Swiss-Prot record:
This is Phosphoribosylaminoimidazole-succinocarboxamide synthase. Signal peptide: none annotated. InterPro entries: SAICAR_synt/ADE2_N, SAICAR_synt_PurC, SAICAR_synth, SAICAR_synthetase, SAICAR_synthetase_CS. Keywords: ATP-binding, Ligase, Nucleotide-binding, Purine biosynthesis. Transmembrane segments: none annotated. Its EC number is 6.3.2.6. GO terms for biological process: 'de novo' IMP biosynthetic process; cobalamin biosynthetic process. Belongs to the SAICAR synthetase family. The keyword Magnesium does not apply. Pathway: Purine metabolism; IMP biosynthesis via de novo pathway; 5-amino-1-(5-phospho-D-ribosyl)imidazole-4-carboxamide from 5-amino-1-(5-phospho-D-ribosyl)imidazole-4-carboxylate: step 1/2. It catalyses: 5-amino-1-(5-phospho-D-ribosyl)imidazole-4-carboxylate + L-aspartate + ATP = (2S)-2-[5-amino-1-(5-phospho-beta-D-ribosyl)imidazole-4-carboxamido]succinate + ADP + phosphate + 2 H(+). One of its GO terms (molecular function) is phosphoribosylaminoimidazolesuccinocarboxamide synthase activity. The keyword Ligase applies.
Amino acid sequence: MTNELVYEGKAKRLFKTEEAGVLRVAYKDDATALNGVRKESFAGKGELNNQITSLIFSHLAGAGIESHFIRAISETEQLVKEVSIIPLEVVVRNVMAGSLAKRLGKEEGELIPNAIVEFYYKDDALDDPFINDDHVLYLELATTSEMDIIRQAARSINKVLQELFNQMNITLIDFKLEFGRDATGNILLADEISPDTCRLWDKETNQKLDKDVFRRNIGNLTDVYTEVLNRLKQVQN
């Protein structure tokens, strides 16, 4: 196992492996908000997100959705296919919340009949601005056909995840996806799917089961992440 660091982000480190085209992802215990301005560490967070992401990506694979995920190799690590990340954050929204509610002057919790798919330019220096397809083409981030693939994949993933979280008695409010190109140019789902990247509300109480408890100082982050993992394990058994 090599320790040559390829990339370090807010929540993960990526390392080379002895196998060409395969990387090792190590999940960190750090939590950030306000695009990294606020940062704290929570013991066990990396382990929780690694397990949750591994289970969800495996579930998506069973539904025919390709991703970079290969397998988990430890409590905090997984192997993934090396991809070139497309600098787009793809956000799928099922219920009004967060920045969308503020932008449109709507109340949080209002159901969106047909899920909204949004794109944000992944650039910390610019604070990840909201962009549309024309901006994507102008910036040469992706082609028209790639955008079609990404948008369709996002909607397919949303359908599978909504069904999964419904079984967990959780409402999938919204979530962020990232995609990358493999060595042959195929578009694959990448990054992670966890309470770091999703808004999750308990169906009965509307209790927030995601990173909003950290952003808004309304609960214990590791407690709610553990609750999500436990519910996920129950429906996967």
